[in-house]
């Protein structure tokens, strides 16, 4: 009996320490726009990910020269061989289009960035939220090609 009372008191103390007089903070929603899309071109693996510019921290933005002063979406493309090793930048040809729906797609310039000795590529599409943004990536390597199409919702 004493053991049950002590356990109850210990549990109550633990709960009261968690409260600290303020309401619990709700969990942040999962950023579904950060979903990764994957395609293979021969033995090359292409992965793309979209990230709202507002979620990129200032030091990362400065380091990679990303303008986060305006709303929009960053498209990050990584290229690796099937073992996860770097590919030579000239080994694969990439083209990207982007559009704020329902507008027609426009070519987007890609910029190479170096990350841990590997070359990744970024493109930025500036637009005001709320917006639906569509990206299409075409990758070509030694006669093989693959497409990745993705749509992201930019929220306020």
Tell where the protein language model's regions lie, with residue ranges.
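Beta-strand-rich structural segments
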Residues: 72-83
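Bacterial Sec-type N-terminal signal peptides, specifically the leucine/valine-rich hydrophobic h-region
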Residues: 12-15
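Edge beta-strands of extracellular beta-sandwich domains
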Residues: 146-154
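Bacterial N-terminal signal peptides that target proteins for export
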Residues: 1-6
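Bacterial signal peptide processing site
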Residues: 18-22
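Beta-strand-rich domain onsets/edges
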Residues: 23-74
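Short, solvent-exposed, Trp/other aromatic-anchored flexible loops in extracytoplasmic proteins
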Residues: 109-136
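Short flexible loop/turn segments that cap and initiate beta-strands
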Residues: 82-96, 103-107
